[in-house]
Regions:
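Active-site region of glycoside hydrolase catalytic domains
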Residues: 50, 56-212
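Substrate-binding cleft and catalytic face of glycoside hydrolase catalytic domains
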Residues: 1-90
Length: 212
């Protein structure tokens, strides 16, 4: 990681903490270097093309990134939390078909084998963080379930990453924000946008109300 870029990340972390908040630092959208290059050998990439990659090299890169990040922030207190990834798909390429392990919307079907791959990526982060010492020895580290989808919690629960620090120093992360409530801006022919949440509807407008 470019040192000046990491300095800018540190400046933002400092602003967050100085304002009395907790900062969560993760590798957010990664342009696919982590998600698309996790298999050893030949596979289909995000653009639907055949490609060959080395999963062990990706794990080394994950560990290398987090070694650099962890050393930069090892003296920070518990107000700084690390997160191993963001919404890890493990070769979650779009535009496929309902064949050869792909669902009808083009996502690679996630199973226990792919959870093992994701687990190893999380463990690469955990090793790097713990080995850096300082407050990172017991810093809280967030690990995500596949795609951070709550209905895939069992896959993470059944194959949870091993933390060298022991138990009690990691958190599981799920994302749940209904598309109609958080991203849509107008009604469509196939669905209505949600303007209200449950009993906050000012009147009888059930069609535009999200019920949790």
């Amino acid at each position: 990681i470019n040192s000046s870029w990491l300095d800018s990340v540190k400046a933002v972390v400092d602003m967050v903490i100085d304002n009395g908040m907790y900062a969560v630092l993760n590798s957010h959208w990664d342009n696919g270097w982590l998600e698309d290059k996790v298999f050893s050998g030949s596979h289909i990439d995000r653009d639907g093309k055949q490609t060959t990659t080395d999963s062990s090299a990706v794990r080394k890169l994950q560990e290398g990134y987090w070694t650099q990040i962890a050393n930069k922030f090892k003296d920070y207190d518990e107000k700084l939390i690390f997160a191993s990834a963001n919404e890890p798909g493990v070769n979650d390429h779009r535009g496929g078909s309902a064949t050869d392990g792909y669902t009808d919307n083009g996502q690679l079907a996630f199973n226990a084998d792919r959870m093992v791959i994701l687990k190893r990526l999380h463990e690469a982060c955990l090793r790097a963080v713990r080995n850096s010492g300082g407050n990172n020895a017991t810093r809280t580290v967030i690990v995500q379930m596949p795609r951070t989808e709550i209905d895939k919690m069992a896959l993470l629960q059944n194959d949870y990453p091993t933390d060298p620090a022991g138990t009690g120093y990691t958190m599981a992360e799920a994302h749940f924000y209904p598309y109609q409530l958080t991203l849509m801006t107008q009604d469509e022919s196939w669905v209505k946008v949600f303007y209200y949440w449950e009993d906050l509807t000012p009147g009888n407008d059930a069609a535009h109300t999200c019920s949790g």
